[in-house]
Amino acid sequence: MQDSMDDSLREAEGRQDDSEVSSGTTLGSSTPEDSGVTAKLRKKYQMASALLRRELEELSVYDAKTAGVSGRSSGSGSGGLALLGGRFHVAPLRIPARRRLQTLVVAWHTSSFIYMTVLVLFLAANPLMWWFMVPYMVYYVWNRSPANGGVVRRYSPRLRSLALWRYYCEYYPISLHKSEDLAPTFVPDPRGAEPREWKLRLWLWPTRVELLNLTLQWTRARPQVATGPRYIFGYHPHGVGALGAFGAIATEGCNWSKVFAGIPACLCTLVNQFQIPIYRDYLLGLGCTSVARKNVLKVLEQNYSVCIVVGGAQEALLSRVGSTELVLNKRKGFIKLALETGNVNLVPIYAFGETDCFNVLDTGNESYLRKFQLWIKKTYGFTIPFFFARGVFNYDFGFLPFRNPINVVVGKPVYVDKRRTNPTMEEIDHYHDLYVQELRNVFDKNKHKFGYAGKELKIVE
């Protein structure tokens, strides 16, 4: 019985082998036309493989140890851009979570006005959210905080102290330096803490039997008292987006309130940014306000200091990697504000590395692109240079700034003592010259520390 089963198995295996040989012979035979098609497919496969190998040779993973301090790619070509013949650097998968968070926060800041605009459009288009949007839009039209000094009431230390702003400053990183201690504007109330008391007493009605007699006592810090001068900080250079000014002054990422205790400062920016609902309130909470003259005067009258990016949009067009060109000769409005206010210190700030965070396209002085930029500036009050830097997942092209150190150095104050109702041009020019001289001192005394040795400060306009 066993022998017959073995014979059957051997016969079945033999039939299977014959079938495989037969099928292999059939598949192996081909006509001349089939051979031509196979050759073409093989040739295309080889070409695709060669192209893929060539592209992979140009692809490299970013190495932080060899890429330099700024985080720029070290490959050949303009900015390491593959489209221009250089190497294309992709982000490695193994990156610490803290660096991921830093990139996420910077991506939020650079595009937050877009996200807020999309959010507002979504809320307005969704009938389920009209219960919120209708009263908010009434409030938006009625409230004029960005234009009447109302930022002082909206100034939120809690929003400014969120942990995410430390990630923002660590990304570059941004560092805050002072040339000397500045006298505080606000000091604690000399009367100390204010005692507070709360009582609760219950009687059994209609009798006078006392059921409960509770007294709670505590102390509350009194509001600080304004005794010192106010400050008008001038921030230089503008760069593409005044990134250092936002991190160092509009947030507590660099511990502004500890480095300059008792000097709350409001960062002034274009009024256009306060026309976006919700985004406007977000900026006000951070202490950002309009750079309009009337508004700045209102803020100073309430003993809050302001920071003005003096060069503005015109200086942004001059931004280049390593550039030290400033627009300052014609910018005297902030000097006049100080004279009209009185008891104000003019303090220059220079941010080393501000112009190194983006690659900017040089449009020339006579090109159509430059004329278009100037038309945008004249019509809408702002303009944006054509720039690129890195992306979220690569290090060669995108709109995120490079990880380039920004060192924000605060200079010594130029004191304006008494208030002048109608300051003369001689007075304005006098204080302007003092301000420019102190700004040059800040640059010259610190340029060797922050990689600007051999460069000179250029005031071109």
From Swiss-Prot:
Pfam family, one: DAGAT
Topological region Cytoplasmic: 1-112, 252-258, 354-461
Biased composition (Basic and acidic residues): 7-18
GO MF annotation terms: 2-acylglycerol O-acyltransferase activity; diacylglycerol O-acyltransferase activity
Topology versus the membrane: Multi-pass membrane protein
Annotated function: Catalyzes the terminal and only committed step in triacylglycerol (TAG) synthesis by using diacylglycerol (DAG) and fatty acyl-CoA as substrates. Required for storage lipid synthesis. Major DAG esterifying enzyme in stationary phase when TAG production is particularly active. Involved in lipid particle synthesis from the endoplasmic reticulum, promoting localized TAG production at discrete ER subdomains.
The protein's name in its UniProt record: Diacylglycerol O-acyltransferase 1
